[in-house]
Amino acid sequence: MARDKETIHSKPTLGQNYPNPFNPSTTIKYELPRSSEVRLSVYDLLGREIAVLVNERREVGGHEVKFDASGLASGVYLYRLKTDDFVQSRKLLLLR
């Protein structure tokens, strides 16, 4: 059984934001199997980085970040989690 747990948590996970669609704020959760340098950023669809939510070393475990999009236009945005050895992106939808 311990082997299964190790396999499940061998790499970071990036959850879907909630609520989604959202207005004006949403929550993003991610989990780290080991401490790591973390950068969690939000991008527009042209690839421009519009917000950096986390840019520091984080410890093992679950983490949660709120994103306030109060100054942004309605539309689809991407958020990306980058660690020492992992990168994943997901879409989020801002509706005004």
State where each predicted segment sits.
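Short beta-strand edge segments in extracellular beta-sheet folds
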Residues: 92-96
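Glycine-centered coil/turn sites that cap beta-strands in beta-rich domains
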Residues: 1-18, 22-42, 64-67
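Short, surface-exposed loop/turn motifs with a glycine/proline- and acidic-biased composition
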Residues: 54-84
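Generic structural signal for well-ordered beta-strand positions
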Residues: 50-51
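Extracellular and select intracellular beta-sandwich modules with Ser/Thr-enriched
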Residues: 86-90
